[in-house]
């Protein structure tokens, strides 16, 4: 059993889906036998507190959610072998902390209205995508990012910009990726705006596989 810190603090836009999403994500982790602590307290990110944590999940966080001590603690803990998973607006967090872009892989800039579009699997061998069809019709809030993920990130999913209005990344438009941060592991998905999306078996399996991939990578090798 591992200790997981589920973090949903917001200081900017707050998604109405957070409560249901936290129940679903927490349930997936508890179903695997893990001890989940759900918090919005930034002081949970202290070196001594993180020492017993295996994974932190940033679920639809937004704005500046940590203080300087928490930022230093998170970066050190993750670089030393921790695990970070980000869901949806996690990339809309910590806009004044440059290092966070290296943790999350990219930074959110804007999005159009919720629309249905085609999601394409890029890496079918990853635990978060192995269950998905090659092309998947999904309704969500399609994020644009300041840049494409860094070269050390593996893009897992893209969305077809031709299918909806408001995409500005060009093709391919990444929406999920994974990669290292020092000796630590990261995974991010932009999916998960609407509360009812978390009732979709495909999205649940996508989330479950992503969480498992950073929490227990040896199980998914």
Task: Locate the predicted segments by residue.
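Glycine-rich, charge-decorated loop segments at or immediately adjacent to ligand/cofactor-binding or catalytic sites
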Residues: 92-103
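Short alpha-beta junction capping motif
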Residues: 4-7, 50-94, 183
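Catalytic beta-strand/loop cores that center a nucleophilic Ser/Cys/Thr
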Residues: 30, 37, 106, 111-182
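A glycine-centered loop/beta-turn motif at secondary-structure junctions
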Residues: 3-4, 148-221
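Short, hinge-like loop/turn segments at secondary-structure boundaries
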Residues: 53-56, 101-105
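Aromatic-Pro/Gly-enriched surface loop or interdomain linker
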Residues: 1-53
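Solvent-exposed loop/turn segments at secondary-structure junctions
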Residues: 11-12, 43, 62-65, 90-94, ...
